[in-house]
């Protein structure tokens, strides 16, 4: 399953602050894709965030709605008032955090967590508990926290690679150990070392049943798992076909527009170059069968394949575009190819047409 956190983790991207209307617009698009959970935000952050969450909660969405909360009763009160079904309570339990950030003992921290979970449960909320910085927290501290969570009937527990530097094999081992406690497991993987997707996959292999993701991989610092990538991995490698792959490009563009954060052209799945072919050998093969250079055809993602024209072009590239103009002339293919190869500039469609007209006159 997928928990999309574009509206919570994604809003922790520098420069990103959604209006209530933008928050709703993104939530509706995520629901159309079919994500299982939408983390709608942290309602205690500001009035604007709270209003946006309430607006989403007023809709009849299929996704489960979860709001973020510190292990504080006043935070949980905001979640209760926001009318969502789930609360995500987090607290860091590493010795370093307990000593330097919170100045409390492990027993005191567990007592605080216990009160927060019990309060949420008493108010009818389902609870996901995250021992923040799970991957760097001492096992004895984790073990005691997870056993407490199980005793309090927490609904899900999240294994968080908060600083994004964990090796995938180590992450797999940790997730398996947590799964053995019998509580359904989420994984929340940051991308600081470029390992978020790999760790998410290893989390799945270790028994996790929910992966946290964001549109365009938004989030603190280097972000977290990209929604389009993990949904496609589930489709391609695990046969999970319940998500709308044909809507991924659309929501990526929408979130880029709202946030003002553009993607690299070579970004997987939703980048502008993801289904663009340039080298003549590649183009020749793709025109025969896209599977030669596309693991899944562009059409699966509601996208169009692009053939790029510059000096790397071959005859098939030129022939392809000439046929679009109704021209079937092998000698002219050679003439135009020679012209293209002599240029250091790419040939846009308009420039291609202009050159055809010039050479034909």
From Swiss-Prot:
InterPro entries: AIPM/Hcit_synth_CS, Aldolase_TIM, Homocitrate_synth, LeuA/HCS_post-cat, PYR_CT. Keywords: Amino-acid biosynthesis, Lysine biosynthesis, Magnesium, Manganese, Metal-binding, Transferase. Mg(2+) binds at residues 9, 188, 190. Its EC number is 2.3.3.14. Its cofactor is Mg(2+); Mn(2+). GO terms for biological process: lysine biosynthetic process via aminoadipic acid. Residues 1-249 form the Pyruvate carboxyltransferase domain. The active site is at 282 (proton acceptor). It catalyses: acetyl-CoA + 2-oxoglutarate + H2O = (2R)-homocitrate + CoA + H(+). Catalyzes the aldol-type condensation of 2-oxoglutarate with acetyl-CoA to yield homocitrate. Carries out the first step of the alpha-aminoadipate (AAA) lysine biosynthesis pathway. This is Homocitrate synthase. It comes from Pyrococcus horikoshii (strain ATCC 700860 / DSM 12428 / JCM 9974 / NBRC 100139 / OT-3).
């Amino acid at each position: 399953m997928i928990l999309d956190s574009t509206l919570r983790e994604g809003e922790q991207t520098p420069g990103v602050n959604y209006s209530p209307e933008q928050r709703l617009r993104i939530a509706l698009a995520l629901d159309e894709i079919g994500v299982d959970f939408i983390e709608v935000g942290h309602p205690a952050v500001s009035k604007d965030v709270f209003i946006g969450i309430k607006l989403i909660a007023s809709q009849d969405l299929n996704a489960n709605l979860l709001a973020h909360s510190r292990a504080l009763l006043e935070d949980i009160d905001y979640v209760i008032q926001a009318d969502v079904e789930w609360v995500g309570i987090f607290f860091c339990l590493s010795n370093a955090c307990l000593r330097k950030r919170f100045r409390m003992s492990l027993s005191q921290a567990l007592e605080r967590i216990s009160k927060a979970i019990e309060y949420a449960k008493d108010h009818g909320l389902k609870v996901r508990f995250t021992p923040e910085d799970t991957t760097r927290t001492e096992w004895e501290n984790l073990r005691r926290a997870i056993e407490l969570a199980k005793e309090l009937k927490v609904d899900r527990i999240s294994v968080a690679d908060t600083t994004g530097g964990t090796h995938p094999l180590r992450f797999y081992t940790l997730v398996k150990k947590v799964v053995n406690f019998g509580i359904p497991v989420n994984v929340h993987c940051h991308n600081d070392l470029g390992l978020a997707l790999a760790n998410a996959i290893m989390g799945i292999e270790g028994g996790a049943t929910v992966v946290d993701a964001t549109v365009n991989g938004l989030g603190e610092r280097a972000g977290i798992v990209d929604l389009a990538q993990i949904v496609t991995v589930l489709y391609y490698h695990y046969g999970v076909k319940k998500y709308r792959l044909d809507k991924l490009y659309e929501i990526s563009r929408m979130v880029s527009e709202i946030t003002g954060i553009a993607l690299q052209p070579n970004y997987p799945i939703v980048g502008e170059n993801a289904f663009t072919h340039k080298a003549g050998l590649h183009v020749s093969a793709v025109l025969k069968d896209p599977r030669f250079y596309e693991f899944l055809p562009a059409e699966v993602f509601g996208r169009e394949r692009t053939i790029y024209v510059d000096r790397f072009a071959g005859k098939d590239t030129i022939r392809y575009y000439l046929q679009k103009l109704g021209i079937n002339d092998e000698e002219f293919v050679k003439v135009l190819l020679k012209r293209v190869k002599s240029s250091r500039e790419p040939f846009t469609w308009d420039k291609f047409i202009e050159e055809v007209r010039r050479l034909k006159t």
